[in-house]
C-alpha cells in the first residue's frame, strides 16, 4: 500500500485536478489513515474502522477524476462502480455483493503481478537456460535423457554473452510453450461462484498442461518464457491468501452516482428494485459483513468506501438514515468558474490542449494556443454551461473538439503549417453557436 503523506498525495492530485482542495484533503487523509492503522498493535488495529467519505458536487467538477487518480496512487486493491448498475437481491441484475467479488479479482491480479515482478530475475535466468538448450542442445545419455554437465561449455557461455547483448534477438527458434487453457465462460447464479470456478478449472485442465511448439524470434520467445517461468514460481494458495488479506486491510471501493439510488419524493407504485432496495443491500457491506467469493471468504469491516453524487434532484438526506451514518465525512465540491476552466486548459499534466497539440503534431501540424485564446475558450464553455445544462469541465471537450474540427479534417494536407488559436480564431468559430441558445443546446 502507499506510504505517501497527505501533503504528497494532494501534491500528486494537483498535477491532474484543478481546485477542489477540500475533497483532495479528505481522500488524502483517508488514504494515510489506512497506513497509520497498520502501524498499530493487532488488538487496537481491529477496533479502528475506516471513516467513509461522501463527495457531493455537480457533474464535471472532478469527483470521478479524483477516484481515477487515487486508484493509481493507492497501490492497494481498488474498484470503481456505478450505483445504478445494481438491483435488489432476487431481481434480474447485479447484486451489490459482486462489488467485493470484483475487488477480490482485482487484488488477485495485483498480487500476481507483484509476485511475478519479485520473481522476474529468477524467471529470466530460467528462460535464458531454455533458450540456450534450444541453441545448443545438451548431450544425451544412453536412455535419451539430457545430461547436466558439471560446468557450462565455452560455446554455451559464448552464446549466453551474445544473448544478453541482444545479438541473437532476431534469430528464429522453435520452442515448446504451454498451450493457452481452454477458455470457458460460465454464467453463474448469485452464490454459486465457487461451483462455477470449479467447473471452469475442470474444463481448463482437460487433457492436462499441454505444450505446443512455436516458431518465434528469440526476443519474443524470451518475453513469453519469462512470463511462463515467473508464473510457475508463484504459489497459488499463498497468492489467494495474500490477495484476500490485501482486500480486507487495504481495499478501497468508490461508488459513483449514489444520488441516483435515492428515494425521490412523491408516491411510486411497485417495488423499488434499484433504489432504496440497493441502499439496504449496500448497508451490510459498508457496516461490515462476510462475502463469499470464489477465492474464499472476505470480511468487509475495514474496506474504505468513498461515495459520490451530484445530488441535483435528490439530497444526501434522501439516503436511508443507516447509510448516511456510515458515510460520516461529507465533502462538497464547488462548481467550476471561468478561471478554473483556464487553469484546466493549461496546468494539468497532459491537459486537453497538450493532447490536441500532440495529436496534430503526428501530421506535422503545429498548433499554438495563445493566452487570450485560452481565456476565450474558457468563457465560451462557461457561457454555454450557464445557458444550457451545466456539465462542468466536460464542456471543454465539446468546445475544443468543435474548435479544431476543421484542422483535424485537413491536417493531412497541412504538413509543416502552424495554426495560431487566439481570441479572434475562437470567436470566428464559436461565437455564433454560443450566442444562439438553441444551437448551443444541440451542438455544444
Swiss-Prot record:
Give the source's domain of life in one word.
Answer: Bacteria
Give the UniProt record's GO annotations in the biological process aspect.
protein unfolding; proteolysis involved in protein catabolic process
Its chief place of residence is cytoplasm
Chain positions recorded as ATP binding sites? 18, 60-65, 256, 322, 394
Cited SUPFAM superfamilies: P-loop containing nucleoside triphosphate hydrolases
Output one GO MF annotation: ATP hydrolysis activity
Database matches in NCBIfam families: hslU, PRK05201.1
- Family designation: Belongs to the ClpX chaperone family. HslU subfamily.
- Subunit (UniProt): A double ring-shaped homohexamer of HslV is capped on each side by a ring-shaped HslU homohexamer. The assembly of the HslU/HslV complex is dependent on binding of ATP.
Q: What is this protein called?
A: ATP-dependent protease ATPase subunit HslU
Query: Which species is this UniProt entry from?
Result: Klebsiella pneumoniae (strain 342)
Tell me the lineage of the source organism. Bacteria, Pseudomonadati, Pseudomonadota, Gammaproteobacteria, Enterobacterales
